Amino acid sequence: FRSEKSLPTEVEDKILSIINETPEVRNPHNLCTRRIGNDFAIEVHIRVDGQITVSRAHELTKEIESKLRLKFGPATHIVLHVEPIKEKKDE
């Protein structure tokens, strides 16, 4: 049995940097990364204004997914969990 390792810190930092390029998204957190064969798997929680529509939240996740796949490859597995901004520290 071999435990999964996270991607290198510099890769995780780049992932967070790409996510933070989206102005409506705040406080990416709970980042989990790993390699699946030659591809990357990325799971992360993001916060958005709780008043935006589900459609807009979906658009934002698609934009972020596109940017991440452009950087890390089209087979990158991405899970974005969207949460509402709930405290000042999230802004």
Q: What residue spans do the PLM features occupy?
A:
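Alpha-helical transmembrane segments and adjacent TM-loop junctions that form the membrane-embedded core
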Residues: 1-91
